[in-house]
Amino acid sequence: MNFKSICLIILLSALIIPYIPQNIYFFPHRNTTGATISSGLYVNPYLYYTSPPAPAGIASFGLYNYSGNVTPYVITTNEMLGYVNITSLLAYNREALRYGVDPYSATLQFNIVLSVNTSNGVYAYWLQDVGQFQTNKNSLTFIDNVWNLTGSLSTLSSSAITGNGQVASAGGGQTFYYDVGPSYTYSFPLSYIYIINMSYTSNAVYVWIGYEIIQIGQTEYGTVNYYDKITIYQPNIISASLMINGNNYTPNGLYYDAELVWGGGGNGAPTSFNSLNCTLGLYYISNGSITPVPSLYTFGADTAEAAYNVYTTMNNGVPIAYNGIENLTILTNNFSVILI
């Protein structure tokens, strides 16, 4: 039995989904092999995915990769943005009901790690701003999750984190925070921006999760909507930031990566994309300016939801994802186009 099969069994055994409309878990990976993940000169993006299906789109592991010559880098910021413009979308997985999600569901996940440095040690929290699609009904719902990556299991309590949502059990001793945001009926083109920003004091981190709809069909928008404002209570904070770090793994062996990736509808489910055409962009705020994340891979690795039949390439300096056989590789070392 291979590693991904073991992970899948663990995830399926943990599914206890309370009946709350649109309540969806977006699982982080877990190191279930018992192997020790040790840091070398830089992280290895291929610990969890070496072949399809994988979360597909664009992601930064904090690595420049020039034909195998790898150089790590670190980005710290208080705000990150994920841009998407979709002109075609249809996904289907006939096995989806086994995971508790609709067969036509899919997600586009904007995932980033919050690093909190305290006098007691370093804590890591996985922030997810997710577009959950019912692709046969042209329905989009925004959902967020927060997971604790500091220990081998994610543990959060209602006294440790508050917001518009709530803490729930994911089974297997894990707890996480989630909130269900607004829903939209869409037509194409559909373009919007995921937005995550944060600030901190000596005893708490404040996270705003939201989006900005740019266009649905022929209607243009432009208003930012923060649908969740989260407080993570943490004593003795020295510093905190949203982090991309190619030098180190999180305390539980995942990545300090930033992901804008397609996957299944939730609960660790994969899906296959029968139709897809979209433009993607990954950005952070530096000195008050929107700045492209420079190097991008074609897949993410922190999330367990994965995709078949998504091929990502560059077109005139811009990442494009459409139907095709996945290639898990470096996409560019020089993303510089500002689409926002």
UniProtKB/Swiss-Prot annotation:
Q: What's a GO biological-process term for it?
A: proteolysis
Signal peptide range in chain numbering: 1-28
Reactions catalysed according to its record: Specificity similar to pepsin A, prefers bulky hydrophobic side-chains on either side of the scissible bond
| Pfam families named in the record | Thermopsin (PF05317)
Q: Summarize what the entry records about the temperature dependence of activity.
A: Optimum temperature is 90 degrees Celsius. Thermostable.
Q: Which residues are glycosylated?
A: 31, 65, 85, 117, 148, 197, 277, 287, 327, 334
Coiled-coil ranges from the UniProt annotation: none
Database matches in InterPro entries: Peptidase_A5
Report the EC code(s) recorded for this entry: 3.4.23.42
Where does this polypeptide localize? Secreted
Cellular component (GO) terms are: extracellular region
Determine the domain of life of the protein's source: Archaea
> How does activity track with pH?
Optimum pH is 2.
The entry's keywords: Aspartyl protease, Glycoprotein, Hydrolase, Protease, Secreted, Signal
A GO MF term: aspartic-type endopeptidase activity
The answer to whether the entry has keyword Methyltransferase is: no
* Propeptide boundaries: 29-41
Entry's family note = Belongs to the peptidase A5 family.
| Function, as annotated | May represent a new class of acid proteases. It digests proteins and peptides in acidic solution.
Could you tell me what this protein is called?
Thermopsin
Organism whose genome encodes this protein: Sulfolobus acidocaldarius (strain ATCC 33909 / DSM 639 / JCM 8929 / NBRC 15157 / NCIMB 11770)
